[in-house]
């Protein structure tokens, strides 16, 4: 499976744009329409597998909630474990947490303390990269637990929102399958 213009266009075209959601002036990129298209979903996972196979990853970490939809099948295809990062109070075992800033306020993410080991090489995945705050907090959690994380993958990137620069400053290599500029 080759990451070419046609396959990337199929993925991008499967993502619906919803104007003025969740508030006026926002163009929401709805990845659930990609999930409804089995060809686009299979292609998305296949391209990610092709890109990341044989690189020695031991875990895929996906962020709540849409990161789970891409991270779990990716981990399964790579033959490695999947680790969810969740909002507070959603994980049953002992956790550590990391706060991060949102446009209007802050939020918190948690991970099980026994989910990542010092010898783990971790790939982080989410559906969309905007400001980078969620992935920055996720990477901090992984590094607190001693894991090595240098790669992050996204289906969608909104480059005008500054997330790419923010994450590259954390020494992360990034890939995204499609970009929506000017949003």
Curated annotation (Swiss-Prot):
GO biological process entries: adenine salvage; AMP salvage; purine ribonucleoside salvage
Q: Can you state which reaction this protein catalyses?
A: AMP + diphosphate = 5-phospho-alpha-D-ribose 1-diphosphate + adenine
Record's subcellular location? Cytoplasm
Which PROSITE patterns does this UniProt record tie to the protein?
Answer: PUR_PYR_PR_TRANSFER
Its annotated pathway?
A: Purine metabolism; AMP biosynthesis via salvage pathway; AMP from adenine: step 1/1
Question: By its UniProt entry, which CDD domains does this protein fall under?
Answer: PRTases_typeI (cd06223)
* Family matches, as Pfam families: Pribosyltran (PF00156)
Family the UniProt entry places it in: Belongs to the purine/pyrimidine phosphoribosyltransferase family.
Q: Which HAMAP family match?
A: Aden_phosphoribosyltr
Say what the protein does.
Answer: Catalyzes a salvage reaction resulting in the formation of AMP, that is energically less costly than de novo synthesis.
Which protein are we looking at? Answer: Adenine phosphoribosyltransferase
